[in-house]
Amino acid sequence: MASTVFLTNRSAESVELNDNDVPLINLAEVETDGKSATASVFGLMARKAICNEGLGCTLVNKDYDPNIKIPVPQRVKNDNDLAFPYGDKEPKDTVFPNVDYDQLQKAMDQAFTNNEVQKTRTVLVAHKNHIIGEKYLEGFTKDTPILGWSMTKSVLATLYGILEYEGKIDLNEPVLLEGWEKDDRKKITLNHLLRMQSGLEWEEDYTSISDVTRMLFMDADMTKAQGEKKAIAAPTEVWNYSSGTSNLLSGILRKRFKTHQEYINYPYQALIDKIGMSSMLMETDMKGNFVGSSYAWANTRIGLSLDYCI
């Protein structure tokens, strides 16, 4: 609720209808003052999210100190006169003779049918670097930031790719977290983590209280959850989708910088602002780590632009 209202300027009523109207979540009572939101179910387990300009919103617990100054990313947004996919100016109206625009429109309309279940917000279709189809749910526009969820993992992985390209990192070097040197986890490399082939135990189940839901909704420091798990297979032996791994990588990335300011600047300086994704914002956990598994916001055009770049 807090992020959606604060970052997208949508009403609380719109969020309740289009985002939170699902079993269990729709039981929550939410209070918001524009800079924070508190939610609870039947008056129990109240959780609060606070919002800060430039950082988005963060779940906090009883240890949160509002008097501590939080560093904000120092951004230099590069506005240019380029259209999609190289900038955010309006694309040229280009018609392709081999595209059946009537069928395209029907396909986009279909994406919004039965929308009380599908909950489609936007549809964007591109062909040969041109936007040829675009449709939005009422209340959404081309400028509305949308939560990227696991697309955020691609942003994080790209940052590691940039570091490798610049010769600043060896993806085949062992990670060697504290305690890993004592067992088979000492064999795990950055490459294994990026490919989600580390062999570490992890449960990615959003329908129950699991590793991923505990991490995203309970942990003040989301970078630790995966690193505390035991190995259940040798590296490369199995593939296991893990948001915990992405946040572990976010924590490892943080340790490569001398200051927290350098860390929170890096995604914007190296990638996001550098290629003109000015509407994108990455949120952090309570300890200031980027939630590299899930919490990047951007409008739909920017999201597709990133796909083109990758």
Range-by-range predicted roles:
Residues 11, 103-107, 171, 186-190, ...:
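Stable alpha-helical elements in mature extracytoplasmic
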Residues 38-39, 105-140:
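A short, well-structured edge-of-sheet supersecondary motif
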Residues 43-115:
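Non-catalytic propeptide/linker segments at domain boundaries
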Residues 102-104, 130-135, 209-235, 261-280:
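Short, charged, amphipathic alpha-helices and their helix-cap/turn boundaries
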Residues 129, 146-172, 193, 248-253, ...:
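Active-site SXXK
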Residues 165-201, 228-231, 258-297:
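Active-site helix/loop module of the DD-peptidase/beta-lactamase fold
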Residues 181-237, 241-247:
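Conserved catalytic neighborhood of penicillin-recognizing serine enzymes
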